[in-house]
Structure formats: C-alpha cells, structure tokens
C-alpha cells in the first residue's frame, strides 16, 4: 500500500513538472510572436518603440500582449519600459495609436528621473503589466485607515528585482512577489514587485519573506526611493496606503485580477462618457505596418547626471 502510494505521488509530481515545462514552452512561444521596431532617436521627442506581430503588423504593448496570468505559479507578463540604472522616463503611451513606448515630457521637455544618492536612475528594471488598468473612474477601497483613491489611469507598474539589466521593449515572464500601494498626487499607483522567472533566484523566492532572505534591505530601500524620488523636482514626499506595508503575493494577484477586469471595461468602450482622458485602445487587426527607422541615441543632457541628497 505504501509503495503504491509512493508511486502515485511520484507520478503526480512528474505530471506537475511536465505541466510546468509545457506552460513554460507555450509562454516562450507566445513571446516569440512579438518583436519591436523603433522610430527616431532615443532621448528625442521623436522616439517611439512599437510592438510588432509575426506578420509585421503593428500592435499595442498595452492591449495586444496577453496578461498570461498563472495563479498557481504566480506569473504574469511584464513589458520592460526602463532598464535598471537608466534615467530616461520611458513609458507606454496612453495617447498615441498602438501605445508605443515613448519618453515622457513636461512642458515640451523630455523627462529624466533624478539620481537619489547613492543610486543612479531607476533602482530596478521598471515596466508595466499588460492588459491591466488602474481605473480612474471609481474610488478603490484600501486599508481600514486609508481614504478611498482613484486609479492613476495607467497599466499596473512593476519593479523587476533580478540580477540582469533588461532591455526596453522586451516581454518577460515574471513571478509576482508582492506589491506596494503608492499614493502619488492623490492617486493610487500600485508598484508590483516581481522577478524574471529565468533569474537564478526565481525558484527560491515566492513571497515577501524570501525577498528579505535573499535580497536583504531591498524592500525598505524600494519604499524609500519611491517616497523621495520626486523631491528634487520640488514635489513633496510620497506616501503609501496600508500603513506603508507591502501586500503579499496572494493579495497582489487579486489586485492584478481586479485591474485586468478594469482593463476589460476600458476596451469595451463602456467608460467613454465617464472620463475624458481614457487611454487609446486601438489594437492590431487592421494590417497597419511601419518602417523601422532606428537612429543612434542622442546625448543625455549633462545635468541629468547630478546627484541629489534627500
């Protein structure tokens, strides 16, 4: 009886492992369905990086890359917008057709993140979770002591903490580890903490406690960076919901699911009369193509290299 039971358990374990391998292969194949093309020179107003499909058609990073949520493995897709240690504030455009990655601007000038001593640029690979949306048309209930907040009208942000510096526009399968509810200019702006599934430490980390074991201090450092990073631009310190505590991976998965449902409402067109500044929802399917016109990157202004002591 014990031998039969052991054989059954072994067989089940092998089946689970085969399923994991199959899902991983399918995920890799899905990622190979996409590529990118670039127009203009990086660090200029004309720079755009577009998603393209296998047939050369232009798609949307925001809407055409699948969320690909696996609740058992706690994995999703991530679009890399800003590689670690770089300063350009690149993001998926909400206004332009097909939502290319562009550099954010303010008053017609390109935006760069300030260097908060002792760091240079963004302290993590920074990006977005596709097919999610933080809904600005409704107030979201948070902790018992928190005021309900509206979403920031963007896809969910994520911070990848692995060892590699990732490439802008790349699509990565990442493991969800937790999240931090940033309050930015009175809006809810979740920061989801993830790690690339191909990182050597990914198999050892599945929640906040393991992050502290393998990356001691990184959660506190991340919170302090997000608290202070706008101060050099004359903004006040940012604050956080839930008494500044990170939410665990299970709660974060629920947040991702809610934001995926919000995204479904967005692309349905049912919210057009509720909000004036909704993101562009044009997706692949009409055969639109563009020429790749890569140009060498322009020089970063020297003042961007300045360190700020906050």
Curated annotation (Swiss-Prot):
Subcellular compartments: Mitochondrion
Gene Ontology terms: biological process: aerobic respiration; phosphate-containing compound metabolic process
Sites where the protein binds Mg(2+) 1: 152, 157, 189
Residues annotated to bind Mg(2+) 2: 157
Keywords annotated in UniProt: Hydrolase, Magnesium, Metal-binding, Mitochondrion, Transit peptide
Presequence extent in this chain: 1-30
Keyword Mitochondrion in annotation: yes
Cofactor(s), names only, from the UniProt record: Mg(2+)
Transmembrane recorded as keyword: no
Single Gene Ontology MF annotation: magnesium ion binding
A GO CC annotation given for this chain: mitochondrion
EC number: 3.6.1.1
Chief subcellular location: mitochondrion
Family: Belongs to the PPase family.
Subunit record text: Homodimer that binds non-covalently to a protein complex in the inner mitochondrial membrane.
Comment field (misc): Present with 195 molecules/cell in log phase SD medium.
Role description: Involved in energy production. Its activity is stimulated by uncouplers of ATP synthesis.
PANTHER family for this protein: INORGANIC PYROPHOSPHATASE (PTHR10286)
Record-given protein name: Inorganic pyrophosphatase, mitochondrial
Species: Saccharomyces cerevisiae (strain ATCC 204508 / S288c) (Baker's yeast)
